[in-house]
Amino acid sequence: MHIIENHNTRAGRVYCYAGECLWDKQLKKYVNPRVLVGHLEGEPPVFVPNKKFSLLLADTSQIETEEHDRKIIAVIKEKYGNSVRLGKPKPVRVQTHTAKAVFSGPSVVFGGITSRYRIDTILTKAFGEDDAKNILSLAWYLASEGDALINSDAWLSHFENPTGHQISSQDITRLLDRMGQDGILSFYKHWLKRFEKTGDKMLYDLTSISWHGHGIDMASWGHNRDNDDLPQVKYALLCTRSTAMPLFAWPLNGSVSDVRTLQDTLAFLDKLDYKPDCLMMDRGFASMENISFMLGRSYKFLQALRVNADWIRKIIDVGKQARLRPSSMIKAGERTYYASTARCQWVTLKKTSKKDTAPAQETLVYQCKDAKGEQYVAQVGEEVISQSPCMVHVLFCQDLVGSQWDKFMEKLNGEYQRLLANKHAEPTNELKKYFTVERKKWARKRNVDFNMERVTNHRDNYTGHICFITNDQTIAVAADALTEYSTRDYIEKDFDEMKNDLDMRRIRVHTDDRMKARLLIQFVAEIYLREIRVRLRDSDECRKMTRKQIASHIKGIYKIKFLGKYKDICPELSKSQRSILEALNIRDSR
């Protein structure tokens, strides 16, 4: 360990640092951490320690001083000897307080929501009373300010909160370490229990949280939704359709494809004794495996589909005449759709193609000829393992043709450039049918070209279509599927809120367990924001308020607390403050 003197030109002062050279096992290189210990003054220079080391140098016993600080003190004495000037303690000014202002707005609003959903009780069951108060206080801070937790001390010391005091960055780190996976999953189990029999449909989606640094094992390269050239962690979120109340959230490895995350999330929910009433998902989760998984375990769902699979194209082709009928027209907003619905059986069967070969398991989608949906009859060499009834809704919109075609051509062109750049690359399964890749005998390069017959067929028959598959009897017609699916923007708003208003665009911790704990605090903060947004949306007075305006009105609620026997005085609320409390159905509890 040694002293480093650095002249700061802007400050016009020489600052002193205690530096050392350490070997980092994880980075496999030497690092040079520095600690500021003071500065030099006068001529000849005299060392003036900062507040921390001034107190340590004044303490002659140093019984409670940490070993690392003792080494720094020894280096300071070795370097400067007697040329050390300790600061004089500032005189303590005694003040006699008659009254003080207590800003209780966040306590009134967030406390009311906490009581409504018993969030404090659930947190206490999962983490104990003290940690529950700390988690609530940090969640209130996030919901109010949306800044990094390390900056919470000023807010916690200014506003009423469950802890009653500020929480240092070291205490926040210890809290994240204590929370643990068992406590986090216990919280989700108790929270999900409140929404067991609501009969509401559930929205499920993923987002990306970028990360730069080391220590997060779950961070990997993958499709980044924010277009950041950084490793990422995927974040799965489940929320209710009617109010978008978040129910469950969990980080996943950043390299896992969207399709494969669904079964992992449902396995988590099954272990927590929760089964969604009806899952609503976008096309990113559509696959034969996922649909078979959900049907086999009796999950109800509404799944948007890509139109690139052969089985869905057959259904589109069969329903073409039905969609040409004027009676198939559906008006939704400014768009016009033409719809058809096919009753199907999702069939899993064993099929033997040759003698002395083991039967192969296959999945097929059988379009029922009967309106009631007859079952599939096994053919020669087939054995039906299971079959589940479902409905496929197909909608065609002329307004979507242009945008879908442009996206399709852009995707084809990107794949074409990739194949030209890498002579060993193969087309993806999704786009394989639209390319011809051949290498002629003795040729140096392979020939990559478009299969224009199939490209033209896609343009003429399949652009402008959106498709859904469901086994929920309450979504019996295509108009119902379109109406239900249009509410998916709720979950997109949740993600935008978490990233832009709750400091979730970057991971700011350095271990997987701390990340999961940090995301739980984020999840609790989102409960408050979602409750405020949904209830204020239905209020004529509050509907046009921005998030900053709402937070400003809430933080402006205060009371004057007198010392001694005098009662507190609660100043009159403004019209906006009264409107917010009325819309939230929260009484003024000052």
Locate each region found by the language model.
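Dynamic "connector" segments at or just before major functional cores
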Residues: 1-215, 236-249, 253-255, 263, ...
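Secondary-structure transition/capping motifs at alpha-helix termini
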Residues: 25, 159-165, 182, 195-198, ...
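Short helix/loop capping segments that flank catalytic or ligand/cofactor-binding pockets
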Residues: 26-27, 149-153, 163-164, 211-214, ...
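Short, basic/hydrophobic alpha-helical segments
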Residues: 190-191, 259-276
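An anionic, glycine-rich sequence signature occurring as long contiguous blocks
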Residues: 231, 248-251, 298-484, 552-590
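Acidic, metal-coordinating catalytic cores used for nucleic-acid/nucleotide bond scission
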Residues: 280-289, 307-310, 513-515
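Short amphipathic alpha-helical "interface-anchor" segments enriched in bulky aromatics
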Residues: 481-508
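Basic, amphipathic alpha-helical segments enriched in Lys/Arg and hydrophobic/aromatic residues
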Residues: 511-532
